[in-house]
Amino acid sequence: MQSFHFGGTEIPPGTGVELSLELGDGPAGNPRSIPVYVLHGSKPGPVLGLVAGIHGDELNGVSVVHHLIHGDDHIANTEDDTINREQLSGTLICVPVVNIEGMLLEQRGAPDNRDINRLFPGKQSGNQSQRIAHALFEGVVSRADYLIDLHSAPHSRTNLPHVRADFDKKECLELARAFGTQIILHSSGPKGSLRREASTKGTPTILLEAGTAHRFEMEAVHSGIEGVLNVMAHLGMIERKSRQPGFRLLVRRSKWARAEAGGLLYSLVKPGDHVKKGQNIALITDPLGAKTHTIQSPRTGVIVGLTLNPLVRAGDPIANIVLCSENKWMQAQVEPDTEVPEEESVDDEESVDDA
């Protein structure tokens, strides 16, 4: 087994090394960089890239990467490490926080207020965010055979753990199935997003959405850990029996339910609930608590995203619903893989993607 070379550093088989992607100096002359941890196995195998924190306020993915590097005790090179480097086949490139400065500012975007996940593959001589995107794309994506991008819902929303992938790319769909969430949503991603540009360049990429921003939610974190390990087992990188959900629903479209009036919101549903078209999913009150409006589901399907903010204005997104008939929902409970046909999920002109 040969050593793995990353940014001029030689990494011997069976070792883990802390590295970085350099970004140039900050305002005070301080060096700026993206932290990277490379686990290089003792056996040959694929290179899997694991990326989190492209949006600085989305922290669940950061914790997923931490646990995969160091185990539950967060101490390197101990017996409880999640991944045994001596038994690892291939290489895992871990990037726990891409947008370091955004994280320190507790905001989604970079310090220049641009969304890094609309700027891939980036530009070496571009603005701050383009340079971050370029460093990640050239340093990690170009080295990876496969990629997993970890996200949470934006501020004041939450997402049921689910994977988004381009169903029209066979390897992406296979990775999504292997990850093992109950819901898999077809989405190639917006132009400039990491998963779209990486997949286009030949690195099959999937995205996990789990939980909300600004916190570590251990249920969401554990779903991410299990999913990454499932993918590694699928790729032959580790020996492990995959832990799959009781059902898996493959859906091609989703639709937002939006508030038609402002006020104080009371949700009547939670992520994972199956709702029927016309079902009451939330109500809006005036400042004294009197009901003024009811929000109904625009389609039949499963709630995968929900606002957490009780203060709403007309047009605000309330619930993201993946489109699925009641028959398909019942079928999914007894069949391992159920795919909702395209004809059940047409007419949605809105983008699913916050990531």
Language-model-detected regions and their locations in the chain:
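Structured catalytic-domain cores with a bias toward divalent-metal coordination
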Residues: 1-355
